[in-house]
C-alpha cells in the first residue's frame, strides 16, 4: 500500500486493469479470495458441485479489499470499457506501474517493454481477516486431458507425450514465444524474467486453481457478469456474493444425490 501511495503521489497509476472481456477483474477477485477464504473452504467445499455454498466471510472481505484499492485511486478509470490487450498497451505506454498478468504473457510483455520489467507474486495480505493460504500461488499450469472413454486412447496419450516433450516444448518457447511448464524447455535464449519465473514456480508451496476454472461453469458465468457490475461499483460486495450464492444453490440442487 505504501508503494501504491508513493506512485499515486508522483502522478502514476499503480495498477492498470481492463475487464472488457469480463475475466480480468475476476482474476483479481479470485486471487484475493485465495488469500481471504480458508483453503479447505475455497478448494475443498466450494470447488465441489455437491457442497458449494460460497458463504464464507472471506469472499466479502476479499472483495472489500479490492474496493479499498479502487476507492484509493489505485486503478485506472473505465475498467470495464478496456479489454485486456488495450490495458496492456496503456501499461506499455507508461501510464501505469503494474499489471496483473499470467506468466504465459511474459514474452509479449518483454516485447512491449523492450525487456525492461520485473515481476512478483501476489503479496501476503497481513490482515486478521485474511484466513486463506498465503503461501500458495494463484493460478494453474496449462495442460491437456485425454478422455478415457474416447477411441484410440493410447494414440492420444502418445501424442500428448510428444507435444509435452522437452524437444517439442523448446519449439513452443523459441518459435511461438509461449511459456512452457516442461522442465528443460527454457534455454539460455529464454528471457531472464521467464527463467526466474519458472524457477519460482518450481519452488512454490502449491497452487490454488483459478476460480474461473475451479468453480462450476454457471457459477463462473455469474462471477464474470456480476464482476463487471462490482468493478463499476454499481453493486456491493454483499450483492455480488449473494448472486454467487444463488447460482451455487442451483448447482448443489442439480448435483444432489
Regions found by a protein language model. Give the residues of each.
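Glycine-centered hinge/linker elements that transmit conformational signals in sensory
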Residues: 4-6, 48-79
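Paired acidic/hydrophobic, glycine-rich loop segments that form the ligand-binding mouth/hinge
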Residues: 16, 97-102, 118-120
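Extracytoplasmic/periplasmic substrate-recognition and gating elements
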Residues: 72, 111-176
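Short helix-initiation/N-cap motifs at beta->coil->alpha
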Residues: 77-92
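Beta->alpha turn/N-cap motifs
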Residues: 84, 101-106, 121-123, 142
Amino acid at each position: 500500500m505504501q508503494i501504491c501511495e508513493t506512485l499515486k503521489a508522483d502522478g502514476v497509476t499503480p495498477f492498470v486493469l481492463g475487464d472488457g472481456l469480463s475475466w480480468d477483474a475476476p482474476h483479481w477477485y479470485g486471487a484475493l479470495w485465495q488469500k481471504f477464504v480458508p483453503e479447505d473452504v475455497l478448494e475443498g467445499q466450494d470447488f465441489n458441485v455437491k457442497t458449494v455454498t460460497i458463504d464464507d466471510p472471506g469472499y466479502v472481505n476479499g472483495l472489500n479489499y479490492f474496493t479499498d484499492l479502487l476507492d484509493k485511486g489505485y486503478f485506472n478509470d473505465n475498467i470495464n470499457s478496456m479489454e485486456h490487450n488495450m490495458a496492456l498497451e496503456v501499461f506499455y505506454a507508461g501510464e501505469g506501474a503494474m499489471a496483473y498478468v499470467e506468466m504465459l504473457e511474459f514474452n509479449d510483455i518483454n516485447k512491449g517493454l523492450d525487456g525492461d520489467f520485473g515481476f512478483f507474486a501476489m503479496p501476503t495480505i497481513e490482515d486478521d481477516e485474511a484466513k486463506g493460504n498465503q503461501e500458495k500461488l494463484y493460478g494453474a499450469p496449462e495442460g491437456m486431458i485425454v478422455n478415457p472413454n474416447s477411441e484410440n486412447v493410447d494414440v492420444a496419450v502418445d501424442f500428448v507425450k510428444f507435444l509435452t516433450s522437452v524437444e517439442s516444448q523448446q519449439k513452443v518457447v523459441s518459435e511461438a514465444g509461449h511459456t512452457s511448464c516442461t522442465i528443460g524447455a527454457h534455454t539460455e535464449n529464454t528471457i531472464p524474467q521467464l527463467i526466474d519465473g519458472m524457477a519460482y514456480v518450481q519452488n512454490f508451496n502449491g497452487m490454488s486453481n483459478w476460480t474461473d476454472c475451479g468453480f462450476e461453469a454457471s457459477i463462473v458465468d455469474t462471477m464474470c457478469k456480476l464482476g463487471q457490475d462490482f468493478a463499476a461499483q454499481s453493486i456491493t460486495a454483499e450483492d455480488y456474493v449473494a448472486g454467487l450464492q444463488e447460482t451455487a444453490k442451483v448447482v448443489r440442487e442439480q448435483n444432489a444425490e
